[in-house]
Structures are given as C-alpha cells and as structure tokens.
Amino acid sequence: MAEQKINTTESGSTASILSIRGLQKSFDSLSVLKDISLSVDRGNVISIIGPSGSGKSTLLRCATFLEHADGGDILYDGQYALKDGVYASKAELNRFRTRFGLVFQNFNLFPHYSVMRNISEAPILHGENREEVRERAMMLLKKMGLEGKENAYPCQLSGGQQQRVAIARALAINPEILFFDEPTRALDPELTGVVLKVIRQLAEDKMTMVVVTHEMPFARAVSNRVIFMDGGVIVEQGHPEEVFGNPTQERTRQFLRNYQQ
C-alpha cells in the first residue's frame, strides 16, 4: 500500500466529521463501490439501507480502514486519511482510528477476557489511567443495563448482552463517531429491541453514528438522513420521511415494497 504524508493542510467542512468523495473499491474484477460520496455531520445519525450485496458493509469497512479503497478521498475532520487513492502514513491512520468506534453484527468480543477487560483493554493500551478507565467502564455498563456483569465472560451472556458489551467497548475510547454494521442481525426479535433501545438513546444523546441496518422502522425513527444503496452506488438519500414516505427512485420504491411484504 502506497503511503505518504497527505495532511499538510486542512480541507473540507468543519461541520462534517467524516467526508467521503468518489470512493471506489473492487474485489478482483467485481466493482463493489462505485464513486461513493457522502458526509456525516456531528451529532447526526446516518442509516444505510439496501439489499444484501449492495456494498453497505464494504463502505463501512473502507471508512474504517478494514478494507483498502482503490480510489477516492476519506477525510476525518477535514484531514485526509485517503487522498486520490493514496493513504496517509500508518501513524496518521492509527491517529484516525482513535476517532471512531466499531460495532459488528457478531459482537467480536474476546472470549477469554472478562466484560471489564473487553471494555477497558483499548483505552489502557492507549495509555489512559487504569482506574479512570475502570470507572468509565462501570458507568458504561450501567448505561447499557449491565450492572453486575463486569466479571462475567462472553459465554455467560445472552446475545443481546454481548452486543451491549460491544457497544460499551466501542464507547470506552470516547469516539467522535460510531459505526454499526447490522448490529441486530444475529439477535432474536426480543433481544433486537433491547439493543435498538440502546442505540436510540445514543442518538438522543447526539452521538454521531453511521448504522448499516435492515431495521427499517428504527432507521426511519432515529436517522437524520437515510442512504439507500444498490449495486455499489447510492441510489437515493435524504430525510427519512422522504426516503421512506415518498422515494423518488423506482429501485428504492421496489426495495421498500419487497421489504414490507
């Protein structure tokens, strides 16, 4: 991967914590992201919807450097992480990684770590005071409705509890933006409601979030903007009432009709 120092000057909107411009990604001959552009303003919730294979998760993985894009720009707070397909240095990318938290559909907790260690490991490794981190972790567990679970191990928790631990872990580094990749897909309906309630509370607290989801009523209720993707492109985006209530594109209407049936 080519690297160079590309943040000699600031660029982009100060209101946008994340800006993506002309992002492209292919796997071999398959183009999965085609000229994707979007921005995420502070305090906003962006929901990304669309059929399986539309590029939603790949977009999140590129935005968080889990996949390397082939072209385009990625900026955090106006600073380039990717410029014209060239990435910033490893040191700069590591600095950008402290700005965001990630929550996946399969929890990704360390099975041999206690709940407390799962939550506190990253900030301690970043040099934060151990006692301060523990205090923050206890506050997060209370916020997640998991008081008394700090010494439990993932295998002793339900799927919904594990996902709430994963959210607490993502919040423990005090991120500026949270990314969720289908956080309820592996959960049964009852546990789904508990996790969505937590994310809804984060939205009310003005946590900046990008959420890939198949939970349409949730996306409509909590989002500032909804993005519909299909075939590696953004087909339509706008206010949730516009996208869900009066979509302008036939493909969007077809997707929503099929989903409701």
Task: Walk through the language-model features, giving the residues of each.
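Helix-to-loop junction immediately C-terminal to a conserved catalytic motif
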Residues: 64
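Conserved ABC transporter NBD signature motif
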Residues: 72-84
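Short coil-to-helix segment of the ABC ATPase nucleotide-binding domain corresponding to the Q-loop/switch region
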Residues: 113-121
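Conserved signature/switch motifs of ABC ATPase nucleotide-binding domains
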Residues: 152-155, 173, 205
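Catalytic Walker B motif of ABC-type/P-loop ATPase nucleotide-binding domains
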Residues: 178-181
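ABC ATPase "signature
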Residues: 237-238
